């Protein structure tokens, strides 16, 4: 998926839809195109897991917003493809347009949907760590890498995310009293659970 240069006098504007989330188009490009499930499967997953929050008028997270936008873009692309299929007389031209939409735009939408669903499901840091791990794995010559690629769903159990900066102080464990959450905390947790 290449970066998009915008028309209408905005040439040279560098848009990367993953930048604000700490990733890049290049980082996602390490994953092969057949890695991403079909748009239909991704839409079914998004609907099954996040339907209520996606349909809500509340702002839940930037990932929910991006997911909504990707879904709306796909709906518009399918509307265009249907229109082209019904109105373009030349079958060869019609097939070229429909195939281009399905192949190129379909891959971009599949990447966007996968990224945001995965961030909502596993957490952004875990997904970024996975992308880096996979990128390192795929660029390592086969003779020097493990036979199996990293798996996102097992990543939190098998890797240690190292953060930059000082290492945290070590403290000896001390017994602590368990405190009940304050009403404010309880309210914020219930709101987060909706999203």
Swiss-Prot record:
Short motif (Bipartite nuclear localization signal): ranges: 170-187
Gene Ontology CC terms, in alphabetical order: host cell; host cell cytoplasm; T=4 icosahedral viral capsid
GO biological process: one example: viral penetration into host nucleus
Post-translational modification: Phosphorylated by host SRPK1, SRPK2, and maybe protein kinase C or GAPDH. Phosphorylation is critical for pregenomic RNA packaging. Protein kinase C phosphorylation is stimulated by HBx protein and may play a role in transport of the viral genome to the nucleus at the late step during the viral replication cycle.
Ranges occupied by Sequence repeats: 167-172, 174-180, 182-188
A Pfam cross-reference name: Hepatitis_core
Keywords: Capsid protein, Cytoplasmic inwards viral transport, DNA-binding, Host cytoplasm, Host-virus interaction, Microtubular inwards viral transport, Phosphoprotein, Repeat, RNA-binding, T=4 icosahedral capsid protein, Viral penetration into host nucleus, Virion, Virus entry into host cell
Keyword Repeat: yes
Name of the protein in question: Capsid protein
Region Disordered, annotated ranges: 148-195
Localisation per UniProt entry: Virion; Host cytoplasm
Keyword flag Repeat: yes
